[in-house]
């Protein structure tokens, strides 16, 4: 039997059974589209992700220790999506969202939908309904660890219910994945870290909610606080490191560092200076920073203040950095070295 005729017959049968478009050639011109992205609020992280930001129509996981900047990063993504006219929602399972801080990061509270569900099932049902609507561009679930199953809430404190949350997440993600892709909605799950008992070799760290999220996520970001930023004796922010642990859309394992300033969020000006020095756009001589023979200031903080007062020079540096994104990405990959986080498994 001729293979071409057999294939045509099979394709016709599939289309009769499941509708036109249920199977197609991947290279058909009208079907191939670029993946839409949402900027993260961090220029270096956008470059490290390889596609200019976080992908729409995919699941993203942001995890790390307490007070490392997980929610801050998610709120920056919401603010960037809103700037582009997107509709965003925030499922606050932890009941801990600070609207004043969110506004300072640039979030438009008037157009942000928020839900504070009582149970994990309720949170995931609301998530599914919003995703299926096709009207939401970015949806954040904060956090997976706070998605408490109804059986656990109704039970006694001492009840042992092993694997209940993992089963809940596994079922929810099976249902959500196709809807997320069809609606082109990005769902960001914020997750916490736990320690595995009795681990002799490798990292004892793991994330909550079982393994399903590791499989379904297209991008996984490990965010850590690596130091403090001081203004004289007062701590005014955190030095933060983000590692792209998994990336289905570009090479993973790139690592970036940026500042998170209390009450302001990610310091864009600090990134412009750091990345500029790496690529050679900003010159550093001793403690002095300069750009195109124009002195920016002595010391990093003075250089940041100069860029704050001269927005046109900051815009010039940002444009030059975006034009050198490929070079920066290679450097970020080299800087990541061979450090492993949670085995760096790409699942």
Curated annotation (Swiss-Prot):
Single GO cellular component term: cytosol
Pfam families: RecA, RecA_C
Record localization: Cytoplasm
Presence of keyword DNA-binding: yes
InterPro entries assigned: AAA+_ATPase, DNA_recomb/repair_RecA, DNA_recomb/repair_RecA_CS, P-loop_NTPase, RecA-like_C, RecA-like_N, RecA_ATP-bd, RecA_C_sf
Role of this protein: Can catalyze the hydrolysis of ATP in the presence of single-stranded DNA, the ATP-dependent uptake of single-stranded DNA by duplex DNA, and the ATP-dependent hybridization of homologous single-stranded DNAs. It interacts with LexA causing its activation and leading to its autocatalytic cleavage.
Similarity comment text for this entry: Belongs to the RecA family.
Protein name, per record: Protein RecA
Native source organism of the sequence: Bartonella tribocorum (strain CIP 105476 / IBS 506)
Gene that this polypeptide is encoded by: recA
